[in-house]
Regions:
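A penicillin-recognizing enzyme superfamily signal
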Residues: 1-139, 143
Length: 147
């Protein structure tokens, strides 16, 4: 899920905080970000490198609007500089044998067909993959909206 931080497929559900980076990244990373009134941070990694950036003021004053993107920009420029001469295959993880990948709808988590426009490859321990008949959010929606 940490790659969803910059994945535009999740815009319908929740605007990914680093979606502006998706066109700038040439490698795959897991990324987490955080924000308060007084600071902002990004931490991301792949199998070769970990990069964390925090910005804020020692006197706890608030960041202004333009400063909130600083940590994100410093993070992506730094980690991409380290990885610039490596291929994606060299920097991402091999999938363990007990893990399987399933394309799912990024909102519902239900499996989708190859023709679906919005799909996200998610990984599961073999035997725990979602099935087309899994209700996922249906029960919650039915209870909340009386369907």
């Amino acid at each position: 899920m940490l790659t969803a931080t910059y994945d535009p497929l999740f815009i319908d559900y929740n605007y990914p905080t680093a979606v502006s980076l998706s066109s700038k990244l040439t490698h795959k990373y897991a990324l987490k970000s955080g924000t308060t009134y007084g600071d902002n941070w990004n931490i991301g990694f792949n199998k070769d490198v970990l990069c964390a950036v925090w910005i804020g003021y020692d006197d706890n004053r608030s960041l202004n609007t333009s400063e909130y993107k600083y940590s994100q920009n410093i993070w992506y420029k730094s980690i991409e500089a380290v990885e610039k001469d490596k291929t994606i295959e060299e920097t991402w993880y091999e999938i363990p044998k007990n893990i399987s990948g399933v394309f799912v709808d990024p909102i519902s988590g239900k499996p989708v067909t190859d023709t679906n426009q919005k799909k996200k490859l998610m990984y599961f321990i073999k035997g725990t993959e979602p099935l087309a008949t899994d209700p996922v959010f249906d029960e919650i929606l039915d209870d909340d909206y009386g369907a």
